[in-house]
């Protein structure tokens, strides 16, 4: 009984949450001449989530160019974006069965660890029948989801008259 009562008053919310700093950096370059316009950007975004052991990082690249020819009647160009995402940790939203929900519902009498040093459980009557939210986050801290996305199009526009033009474009959206 001492082993249980000495760990009373577990602050589950504090056990599963953390400060969540965010940082975002971008570098842009753009310019134009009479016959061309261009814009390039490189970005980095990083965020720790409010739940421990979870984070998100993204690197993105964007390029837009446009060129004029044939007495300024023809315009060709492209728009291209590439991004690489890295998610670390547990990213689920299972209604009420997630670490955030359990963090405020879990009984404070239950410890994070049992007397053997293993994660303590709580499946039982009158204890909320919830899982150990800290254990769930900790066990998934090395889970990773990597995603690459390529999105772009090329186009050509020809001005037949000032009131009439023809445009053709081809685009792609690749996710992997």
Language-model segments: residues:
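Short strand-turn segments of transmembrane beta-barrel domains in outer membranes
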Residues: 2-28, 41-51
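Surface-exposed loop/interface segments of Gram-negative outer-membrane beta-barrel transport/assembly proteins
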Residues: 1-8, 49-54, 60-151, 167-176
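Aromatic-residue hotspot detector
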Residues: 12, 56, 153-155
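Beta-strand residues in well-ordered beta-sheet regions across diverse protein folds
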Residues: 39-41, 77
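Outer-membrane beta-barrel transmembrane strands
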Residues: 18-36, 43-45, 135-174
């Amino acid at each position: 009984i001492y082993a249980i009562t000495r760990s009373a008053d577990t602050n589950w919310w504090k056990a599963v949450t953390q400060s969540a700093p965010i940082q975002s950096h971008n570098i842009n370059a753009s310019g134009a001449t009479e016959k061309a316009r261009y814009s390039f950007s490189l970005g980095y975004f990083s965020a720790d989530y409010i739940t421990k052991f979870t984070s998100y990082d993204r690197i993105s690249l964007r390029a837009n160019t446009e060129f004029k020819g044939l007495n300024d009647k023809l315009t060709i160009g492209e728009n291209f974006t590439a991004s690489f995402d890295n998610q670390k940790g547990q990213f689920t939203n299972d209604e009420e069965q997630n670490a955030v929900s359990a963090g405020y519902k879990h009984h404070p009498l239950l410890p994070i660890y049992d007397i053997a040093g293993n994660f303590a459980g709580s499946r039982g009557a009158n204890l909320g029948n919830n899982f150990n939210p800290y254990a769930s986050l900790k066990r998934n801290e090395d889970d990773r989801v990597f995603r690459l996305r390529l999105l772009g199009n090329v186009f050509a526009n020809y001005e037949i008259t000032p009131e009439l033009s023809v445009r053709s474009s081809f685009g792609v959206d690749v996710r992997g």
